[in-house]
Amino acid sequence: MRGQIDELDNQLMELLAKRMRVCREIGTYKKEHNMTIVQTNRYNEILEKRGAQASLCGMSPEFAAQIFEHIHEESVRQQLEILNQK
């Protein structure tokens, strides 16, 4: 069973890496179009949708919110790096 957990953890990391690649592409788009990095409405929409999804999957919405808050922080960090490049 530990092997299964390890494989799932690897898959999670690969998916997060893919998500961050897309976030960097979005960061480039935002830089080119003089947009702010944080889009509050979109962030709130994600938290709401993932909270509802967590409930359907037998997890607490608070758990999902914590995960996605950390994902969002890293996304913002990476997009800020792009924005600050000259």
Describe each PLM feature range.
Residues 1-86:
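Domain-level signature for soluble enzymes in the chorismate/prephenate branch of the shikimate pathway
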